[in-house]
């Protein structure tokens, strides 16, 4: 029983990831016990309200979700939102692919 899960199916799992200076984020991969759950990736801005801009969508099957080229700035970061439909669904982890500028 590793990974994270929700206590109520109305909840979502959220992760925020800094994009290190001098790098570009290009892909996100997420693994989970149910490989069909929806993953949404947003480029966020620390100086703005709301969810930001959607840069990619996919599922929890571990396949790379292309997010284009999200260059690091002084105000941006990534938010990954995973929607699950059961308290038994677990998210084991994920990776963000970075390239050096």
Residues of each region from the PLM?
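Extracellular beta-rich ligand/substrate-recognition surface
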Residues: 1-12
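Extended extracellular/luminal ectodomain segments enriched in beta-structured repeat modules
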Residues: 10, 19-27
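C-terminal interaction-tip segments
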Residues: 14, 85-101
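Short edge beta-strand/loop segments characteristic of extracellular beta-sandwich folds
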Residues: 16, 29-31
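Short proline/glycine-enriched turn/loop motifs at strand-loop junctions of beta-rich domains
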Residues: 23, 33-37
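Short, surface-exposed beta-strand/strand-loop-strand elements in extracellular ectodomains
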Residues: 36-49
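Extracellular carbohydrate recognition and processing domains
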Residues: 50-72
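Noncatalytic modules at the cell exterior or secretory-pathway interfaces
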Residues: 69-92
């Amino acid at each position: 029983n590793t990974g994270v899960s929700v206590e109520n199916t109305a909840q979502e799992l959220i992760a925020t990831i800094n994009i290190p200076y001098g790098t570009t984020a290009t892909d996100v991969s997420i693994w989970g016990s149910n490989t069909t759950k929806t993953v949404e990736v947003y480029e966020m801005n620390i100086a703005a309200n709301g969810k930001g801009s959607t840069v990619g969508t996919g599922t929890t099957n571990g396949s790379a979700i292309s997010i284009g080229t999200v260059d690091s700035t002084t105000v941006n970061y990534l938010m990954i939102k995973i929607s699950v439909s059961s308290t038994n669904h677990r998210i084991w982890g994920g990776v963000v692919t970075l390239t050096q500028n």
